[in-house]
Amino acid sequence: LGGAGSKGYPNLNDDDWLWGGTLAEIQTTLEHGIRSTNDDKTRVSAMPAFGKDGVLKKEEVRLVANFVRSIGGLSTEAGFDKAKGAKIYEENCAACHGDKGAGNKELGAPNLADAIWLYGSGIEDIVETVTNSRAGLMPAWSGRLDPITIKSLTVYVHSLGGGK
């Protein structure tokens, strides 16, 4: 209990809500889930596996991973070429994550400019994400819980501190 999350599972106590932290947005996520196979209204987002799919070469993945760390105020590898990383980011990432990396709740694209990292902020963590993508899941609870229980759960999750 408490919603603190762990690597790969979101912290419900912070302000980093992939799909929005209002009561209505939380309720929609609880009702329909994320990539739930049994709900046509489930929330879906898909980041390409840029490395695995051959969109980016290994050195380009590393450049963009360093650039992402730099916009989040984190250290980068020695010799990192920020201009090259920025160009790769602009061409491949900005459409979803925004020019400044602030994310897009409508798409479920996380904020890359804050200190909150669902899968880790290390260079190898980011390289892994850019190379192979990530696809978190959450079941749709509308078929398992009655509407009153979902509303109660919505209010509880919102009260943990991260809701807006």
Feature-to-residue mapping (PLM):
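Poly-acidic low-complexity segments
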Residues: N11, E77-D81, N111
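Extracytoplasmic electron-transfer domains, predominantly the class I c-type cytochrome c fold
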Residues: K7, N13-V68, E106-G162
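Electrostatic cytochrome c docking/interface patches
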Residues: L63-I88, K164
